[in-house]
A protein has these predicted regions:
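Compositionally biased P/S/T/G-rich terminal and signal peptide-adjacent segments
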Residues: 1-32
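Amphipathic alpha-helical segments
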Residues: 10, 35-56
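Ser/Thr-rich, low-complexity intrinsically disordered terminal regions
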Residues: 55-78
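Active-site environment of divalent metal-dependent phosphoester hydrolases
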Residues: 121, 143-144, 173-179, 204-207, ...
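Binuclear metal-ion centers of metallo-dependent hydrolases, dominated by the metallo-beta-lactamase
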Residues: 196, 204, 208-257, 271-274, ...
């Protein structure tokens, strides 16, 4: 019988050259076979049956194939990603997948999703099932308001004296996602019932199994509370399940299919941080599909390459609070495939429209280029009843919030006139960038009766900055291969009147200590 201790005696088995072998925790071993074929995948499936495993499940969509095998106390979950030619085989000792069950009670209430109120950002979602039980996804930080808001949501929506949580799904060990679970269980011990918990990250004694964890920033202030989490979880008496990609769990009247987990990314050399090991889930409920992305990186999880049009969903939880996740183009490809009608964005309005999210390339694509009916941010808390259709006014509401955020942050284009080269201070400007990302600014200098200097490039970091626009240590005047009017090729005339134009990719405020701007404007898409 194959198990995690002897699996390397059987894998690789068909002459493959590129095989990764990783223990992801004490009971799970993952093999990734690159540049492979569907024929090899079928051969592995036959091999597992020859070794005494029973095929329990098979499903496919597009070029994706999933097969689950049950052995004595061991499960094997084999995937073929046809579009990237990769076989992924997870071997799990003490697997509970085949004994999992959940009993759906009589219908008592309508199904709902609540995005729990957040002061800043985090991830806290409550799904109310038709039988009155709940699913919690993450929970947020261990801040008292996060903890209390979550309990209040459960208590007010519950049909029972004690809210019954059918399953608490923890997507990854980041403080703004799982720390609330610890504080919630401690503060409200005995006031709720937790039936099951689902997550896929290492036990406290399994960190030695990972490669270069310190280098990729896995262990630190976010993850050091994992041992405490396990202690708290044990006290709840909940059954614990480790979901793997391809598995489907029926929870009440909701169905969860897992599209990504640590086993998909941990073996790759490009693995950078714990966001990439997020559980990504495709939930079906009340005839609608919801895609929960947590903080997943579309680039490194390769979601679009693996699933393509299967990602289509009615409702999307925008990944990583809309902050971007290491790969704008890959995120945009995913969002286009998902093509949602409604989006959840787990960040407060301020964080989204004034500080960060709306100005990240991929999130901005959703706001300005996709025909999304509604974007629900987390600042006030939002509850939708399923099946859900956005109100007719919702699109205009988020468009107005975005336009207001742009105007409040400044302008994209600024002109200053009446300057003179005789005063070197006239070349020095102050820049207030209130958005938490660098502004890319192009600068043109127009001299009276002399050649202009064109397309000076400057990067303006977040916060207040001051520099001379002709200081070659602060600006790049020669970044273009061919620019006859570059900073190094045009001599600055003496005692000459000049004007300056700034064009920025994000709104900012530009000012001069001696001169008021002549004109400024913004373009809101």
């Amino acid at each position: 019988m194959i198990d995690i201790n002897n699996a390397n005696e059987f894998i690789p088995h068909f002459g493959e050259e590129v095989v990764s072998d990783t223990l992801t925790n004490n009971n799970n071993r993952v093999f990734a076979i690159s540049d492979s074929t569907f024929e090899n995948y079928e051969n592995y499936c036959k091999l597992f049956e020859e070794k005494g495993f029973v095929k329990r499940e098979y499903r496919s969509h597009g070029s994706f194939h999933f097969t689950a095998f049950e052995g004595e106390n061991t499960g094997i979950f084999a995937i073929f990603y046809g579009d990237i030619k990769e076989i992924n085989i997870t071997i799990e000792n003490e697997s509970k997948y085949f004994t999992y069950s959940d009993i759906l009670g009589d219908k008592k209430v309508s199904s709902q999703i609540t995005q729990v109120k957040l002061e800043d950002y985090g991830m806290s979602y409550v799904i109310r099932l038709s039988d009155g039980r709940f699913i919690v996804i993450d929970g947020g930080r261990n801040y008292e308001p996060h903890v209390d808001n979550l309990f209040k949501c459960l208590k007010e929506s519950s049909q029972d004296e004690k809210p019954v949580i059918a399953s608490w799904i923890l997507t990854h060990p980041d403080s703004d996602h799982y720390h609330c679970f610890i504080a919630f269980c401690e503060k409200y011990e005995g006031e709720f019932i937790l039936q099951k918990a689902m997550f896929n990250f290492p036990e406290p004694d399994a960190y030695h199994l990972y490669h270069d964890l310190a280098k990729v920033g896995y262990w630190g202030c976010d993850t050091e509370r994992l041992p405490h989490m396990y202690e708290v979880l044990k006290k709840t008496g909940a059954e614990v399940y480790t979901p793997h990609t391809g598995q489907i769990y029926e929870i009440g009247n909701a169905s969860f299919e897992f599209l990504n987990c640590i086993g998909d990314v941990v073996h790759h050399t490009y693995w950078k941080n714990k966001n990439e090991l997020c559980l990504v889930t495709r939930m079906e409920i009340e005839g609608q599909t919801v895609l929960w992305m947590a903080d997943s990186s579309c680039k490194y999880s390769r979601l679009y390459e693996k699933y393509g049009s299967y990602l289509k969903a009615d409702i999307l939880q925008i990944t990583h609070h809309g902050f971007g996740s290491l790969g704008d183009n890959e995120e945009i490809a995913c969002y286009n495939a998902i093509n949602p009608s409604v989006c959840f964005l787990p960040a407060a309005d301020y964080k989204c429209y004034h500080r960060m999210s709306a100005y990240r390339k991929s999130t901005n694509h959703i706001i300005t280029k996709m025909d999304v009916d509604e974007i629900l941010t987390g600042g006030d808390g939002e509850t939708i009843t399923l099946p859900y259709k956005a109100p007719s006014t919702a699109k205009e509401e988020y468009k107005q919030k975005y336009a207001r955020g742009v105007m409040d942050n400044g302008a994209h284009c600024w002109y200053f006139t009446g300057l003179n080269t005789a005063d070197k201070d006239d070349f020095t400007f102050s820049f207030l960038n209130a958005i938490n990302q660098p502004a890319n600014v192009e600068i043109n200098i127009y001299f009276k009766d002399s050649k202009d200097i064109e397309r000076i490039k400057a990067t303006v970091p977040y916060s207040l900055n001051e520099f001379s626009i002709i200081d070659k240590e602060k600006v790049d005047g020669d970044w273009l291969f061919h620019n006859p009017n570059s900073l190094s090729k045009i001599e600055i005339p003496e005692n000459t009147e000049f004007a300056v134009r700034f064009i920025s990719d994000i709104p900012l405020v530009i000012f001069h200590k001696d001169h008021k701007d002549t004109y400024h404007t913004s373009y809101v898409k």
